Amino acid sequence: MNYFPDEVIEHVFDFVTSHKDRNAISLVCKSWYKIERYSRQKVFIGNCYAINPERLLRRFPCLKSLTLKGKPHFADFNLVPHEWGGFVLPWIEALARSRVGLEELRLKRMVVTDESLELLSRSFVNFKSLVLVSCEGFTTDGLASIAANCRHLRDLDLQENEIDDHRGQWLSCFPDTCTTLVTLNFACLEGETNLVALERLVARSPNLKSLKLNRAVPLDALARLMACAPQIVDLGVGSYENDPDSESYLKLMAVIKKCTSLRSLSGFLEAAPHCLSAFHPICHNLTSLNLSYAAEIHGSHLIKLIQHCKKLQRLWILDSIGDKGLEVVASTCKELQELRVFPSDLLGGGNTAVTEEGLVAISAGCPKLHSILYFCQQMTNAALVTVAKNCPNFIRFRLCILEPNKPDHVTSQPLDEGFGAIVKACKSLRRLSLSGLLTDQVFLYIGMYANQLEMLSIAFAGDTDKGMLYVLNGCKKMKKLEIRDSPFGDTALLADVSKYETMRSLWMSSCEVTLSGCKRLAEKAPWLNVEIINENDNNRMEENGHEGRQKVDKLYLYRTVVGTRMDAPPFVWIL
């Protein structure tokens, strides 16, 4: 294609949006590499320590949108120490020095300080979008800087962050000239909200499509907000407690009927279930419903709400819905594509809420289902075989049995055959999480049949090193492998070091890996960062005559092109 001018090729590249496809076309020839270099504006980095910002900017000098991830995924389950790292400040400093025209920044599991938010807000004139997911380290003072200084802000999306609320006045820092907001999500904030400032901001934002409120926004304020913004598509309700005969409730009911654009509903952080009927008139339009934080909504009130939601494609719910409730979902929501069922009783002291019966019902009634996360207290091989037959289009299948090592509760057999049926039937499966009593046999099935698998999470599973080897040898597209409390050791770790060159990362905690094995791995694979995370009192592994047999608590290894990171805390030993 050398006879095409560069301008034509660049225009064609503009239609290639997949990061994987952009990477592939940059490898075709030097000319395409150069064109792709200067035309790529969006970059995704799955590990902030795999590259440094200076090298990124040399590679893509016209960067406008950056997505950056920090801590490993198991940080979501408190398996990564709080002070491990993942600091965004060095990235923002480098971006500011380069004077790149950054417009969008998306961060996940990173440490974000007020200083970094202040610098971000003052360094990029056309900055438009900030999305923070599961981040920590900042306060509402940092949010105030973003509000005050980002004059073209379109999206401020705060999802499940740990934020210190110094005052509830940060919303008043948006200037009166700010009319560009499309997304405003502060549901994770715990403190008070300046309702006057919020209502004024919403009223002057004609393009606002997504609004998610915290529990400090009461029902009467919600009614006023929705009256100002009937164009809202995605609504997150905060506090929802009122008498259904109250004036506030009646006003909300009248306003909601006019919100014909609503397609997504979430929140209800504090709710009076009998008030849900106010939303029934618009439920027939909903495609997404997230009640994973609505612990007070259950029973008949929940069932009635779902029965009105016939177009749902995405449902996040608590397991208090029960098997009978899932049967209602199955009979009502024929367009359902994604289901997540979260535990309402993490201590496991209550009665079994959902079982294999609910999962089978969903698989039979929702033929378009392709993604599931299902927390339950029991499962059977027969149920998993049925699910595999009913839903062969799964791309994500995550099953968490809350009691580790629990077998098929009918036959007392391992769940190998059930998960084997899933990987055999679901040819496009890319993400899989296992639980229950499992032997090496299930990993043989995974290695043989899960040809498209990119991420695998293992807990309390397997018999020997063979199990891990089956996966490493068979799953050619594996990117992330995370293992905890399983009997895999040095033999599996060291069998094929070259495999890690094509993977993004490997996490192993409470396994049989030794310090000696980790050192040998580091020697064989200098392109890897091999991190030993040790939280004992000495903050160091003991280096003595027995170190070869000393097990490591946590191993995290990942590819890098910039060598060892410089911000590791004392309890992280980088080999």
UniProtKB/Swiss-Prot annotation:
GO biological process: auxin-activated signaling pathway; defense response; pollen maturation; protein ubiquitination; stamen development
Organism: Arabidopsis thaliana (Mouse-ear cress)
Quaternary structure and partners: Part of a SCF (SKP1-cullin-F-box) protein ligase complex. Interacts with Aux/IAA proteins (IAA7) in an auxin-dependent manner.
Region (Interaction with auxin-responsive proteins), start-end ranges: 76-77, 343-348, 400-404, 459-460
Higher taxonomy: Eukaryota, Viridiplantae, Streptophyta, Embryophyta, Tracheophyta
Function field: Component of SCF(ASK-cullin-F-box) E3 ubiquitin ligase complexes, which may mediate the ubiquitination and subsequent proteasomal degradation of target proteins. Confers sensitivity to the virulent bacterial pathogen P.syringae. Auxin receptor that mediates Aux/IAA proteins proteasomal degradation and auxin-regulated transcription. Involved in embryogenesis regulation by auxin.
GO molecular function per UniProt: auxin binding; inositol hexakisphosphate binding
Keyword field contains Nucleus: yes
Domain notes: The F-box is necessary for the interaction with SKP1.
Tissues/organs with expression: Ubiquitous, with higher levels in seedlings.
CDD domains (alphabetical): F-box_AtTIR1-like
GO CC terms of this entry: nucleus; plant-type vacuole; SCF ubiquitin ligase complex
Name this protein carries in UniProt: Protein AUXIN SIGNALING F-BOX 2
